[in-house]
Each structure stands twice: as structure tokens, then as C-alpha cells.
From Swiss-Prot:
SUPFAM superfamilies: GHMP Kinase, C-terminal domain, Ribosomal protein S5 domain 2-like. The lineage of its organism: Bacteria, Pseudomonadati, Chlorobiota, Chlorobiia, Chlorobiales. Transmembrane segments: none annotated. This is 4-diphosphocytidyl-2-C-methyl-D-erythritol kinase. Catalyzes the phosphorylation of the position 2 hydroxy group of 4-diphosphocytidyl-2C-methyl-D-erythritol. The active site is at K11, D135. It catalyses: 4-CDP-2-C-methyl-D-erythritol + ATP = 4-CDP-2-C-methyl-D-erythritol 2-phosphate + ADP + H(+).
Amino acid sequence: MQSISVKAYAKINLGLLITGKRPDGYHTLETVFAPINWYDELTFSPSQEVRMSCTNQDLPCDDSNLCIRAAKALRDFSGVSSGVEIGLAKHIPFGAGLGGGSSDAASTLRVLNRMWNINASSHDLHRIAVGLGADVPYFLESGGLAYAAGIGEELEDLELTLPFSIVTLFPGDHISTVWAYRNFYACFEREIPDLKGLVRSLCQARDTSVLEVFDNDFEPVVFDHYPAVREAKDALVQSGSFFASLSGSGSAVFGLFENDSDAERAAEQLSATYRARFTPASFAMA
């Protein structure tokens, strides 16, 4: 069998509201995922064992890596004895809140389900994905905007794309999601806005006023401890973004722009200071 190569795209969060904490310690949330044009490249080759290599030497390639965990979880589910050599060309910054590791894991499930002739159902793959992480189901099942709730297991593809251009900045800090959940300023007693309805107004009527309720609950604690992240958000606004926010638990931030030309110009200017990536309006994962 020949090798298979794929791209694994990153995401941003339009709003990230932490709604509670379960008895098992997991936090529940509501968010809207949107894809961006920042991707890793993965190559899957037949092998006797499950193993991995990566262009970024700071990333482990052992059982703690989500790709390895995804491959072994699928193998355990199916009972196959096949192996795979995974080659990861890492471009999405890690510890940035862009879901790079989750996207890589979703690509691993999708490719190996075919390569190993498992033909697991979408329901079975969803269960495996939920066990790997809150963002993994999104990358497995959606190409555009999607609403997620619970611990990520409640996922609804909104069948929409964002009609605005995006500039994403990585300030350089690597922020642990575990740290962010331990330290964010909890406020569970509040009314949660209808993110699904509001994002439809945003996309279908270009009603940008709805964005005022698209808060990210990690922003206050991240900005307090990582001032460079706040500065990056401010830089986006100064460059013409009409809405800017932290993505996930950071440290990446993103800004929305009215058109591609303004966004491209801002990305080029900001690339002198940050790792910057432009995403055109109405982008969807291939």
C-alpha cells in the first residue's frame, strides 16, 4: 500500500464560554469553531509498528502524542494488528489554542480507518474522538463553522462559513490548557447567549453587533499572566480588525476583517513582529 499524505487544519473559537464543572472534574463549555488556513502536513506509511517522527524536536513522539494515541485507540477498537509510520511536518504552533494536535489526531483516525480497512462508522469514530480531546470531534466531522457543547461531544455542523477574513497571530508563548482551566476566573451563574442563533446572524446578515457577546472566558487570566498576548490582540485592532479575541486557551489571537485585501495587508505588517497567518473569507477545510 502506498503512503497517504494529508493536511490537518487549525481552528479558532468564536466565543468560548465555560458553563460548569462536572463531578469527574471536566469542565463543560459552549463555543463555535471556525477553520483557518494554517495546517500541519502528515504522511502515513505502512509499518509493522505504530511509530512517529516530527519536524519539531520539542514535540514528543511517544504515547503522549495525540497521533499515537489516536492510532492505538483505533487499533484497540478494531482489533487489527497493523502498524503505521506517521511523519508530521509541524507548522501549527503548539500550546497556542489552535487545535493543531487535535486536528492531527482527527486526520490520523480518518486516514487509518481507511488504510487499515476498518470502516468504522461515524458514530464509533466520534466516540473515539471524544476520548482523545474536546476539539477532536470537530476536526473529524466538520469543514466549516460548528457549534460545540458539553466536553466537546455535543457537536453540530452549522453548514456555514464565516464571511469575513481572518488574521491569526502567535505571540510565542506556549500556554497549557490544563493551567488555563485551573486558573480561569469562574463565573458559572450567568445567562448563556444563543451562540448558534447569533453566529447565523453574523454569517447570513453580516450583523457584527452580535460579536459583543462572543467572549472567551480564558482571556482575563491569560492576559493577566501573559501581557504579550494582550498586546497581540491590541495590535490586531490597531491594524483594522473590527473584532479580535483569544483562540482557545491561547496564546494565539485572531482578528476579523471586512475583506481579504485589508486582512492580507495587516498580516503582512504584523508578520514583522509575530507569526501571522491570513485566512480568506468563507474558508472551509478541504
